[in-house]
Design a protein with these regions (language model features):
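Glycine-rich beta-strand-to-loop/alpha-helix junction loops that act as flexible
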Residues: 7, 87-89, 120-122
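Short, flexible loop segments at the rims of nucleotide/cofactor-binding pockets, characterized by
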Residues: 8-12, 62-66, 94-97, 136, ...
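Ordered, amphipathic secondary-structure segments that act as subunit-interaction surfaces
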Residues: 79, 83-89, 93
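Active-site-adjacent pocket-lining segments in enzyme domains
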Residues: 86, 95-116, 123-208
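Short, glycine/serine-rich, charged loops/turns that create anion-binding
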Residues: 10, 39, 90, 131, ...
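Short, conserved acidic/polar surface loops in the N-terminal third of protein domains
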Residues: 44-45, 77-79, 94-98, 129
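N-terminal beta1-alpha1 cap of cysteine-dependent amidohydrolase-like domains
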Residues: 1-83
Length: 208
């Protein structure tokens, strides 16, 4: 199992380099299943939008890129892939979308089989123990009541710390409160930091 979790995945040069340093092969050779956030529509999924974005990130051939469509979730089981990638978005809505498609267990199966998971912000939260602390940071407009996430990462994350555009004082307060509760292992990340998670250890990385 290997998961690369960060605030900004490919949109920050430091976290992007950590991803590149921890893959089993060159990014351009990897086959990837990309799961878009809650804003994805049928039209966007079946357009060039996400393909162009992933190629810009460094993924290679279009035929090596799979864009998840929850209306056809069966098609995305048992793929021959190297990476599952979930980026930013509304965590509550994205987790709900994955659950409704009954794809949460499929993600777990892929990761346990050795597929590398890349999660940025929302994507990082998806594999943690719980997302209830995000009620202070994101709009739970779909009113989900089950805040347990996939539980593949033994802890919770407070991302985007120290970034002025992401209410750093509030994030520091949430981090301190979570530490006092002692319910979960708590990790905070700046926009440049990443966590490399394997079955044996968790490594915090900052790559210049």
């Amino acid at each position: 199992m290997k998961m690369i979790l960060s605030s900004c995945d490919f949109s920050n040069p430091n976290s992007k380099q950590v991803i590149l340093d921890n893959l089993d092969k060159k990014l351009c050779e990897c086959k990837v299943l990309f799961i878009p956030n809650q804003k994805a529509t049928y039209e966007k999924i079946h357009s060039d939008k996400y393909y162009d974005r992933l190629i810009e990130c460094g993924f290679g051939k279009r035929e090596n890129i799979y864009i998840f469509d929850e209306s056809e979730s069966e098609k995305f089981k048992n793929l021959n892939i190297d990476i599952i990638y979930i980026s930013g978005g509304n965590t509550f809505a994205t987790l709900n979308k994955i659950r409704k498609a009954n794809f949460d267990n499929e993600i777990k199966k892929y990761i346990k089989k050795g597929v590398i998971y890349i999660g940025g912000s929302c994507g990082a939260h998806i594999v943690t123990r719980n997302i209830e602390h995000l009620l202070k940071l994101e709009d739970n407009y779909i009113n989900i009541m089950d805040f347990n996430a996939l539980g593949l990462f033994d802890g919770v994350i407070v991302p985007h710390c120290e970034a002025n555009e992401y209410t750093p004082e509030l994030r520091e307060k949430i981090y301190s409160e979570l530490l006092k509760e002692k319910k979960y292992n708590v990790y905070k990340l700046t926009n440049a930091e990443s966590l490399i998670v394997t079955e044996e250890k968790i490594i915090k990385k900052y790559r210049k």
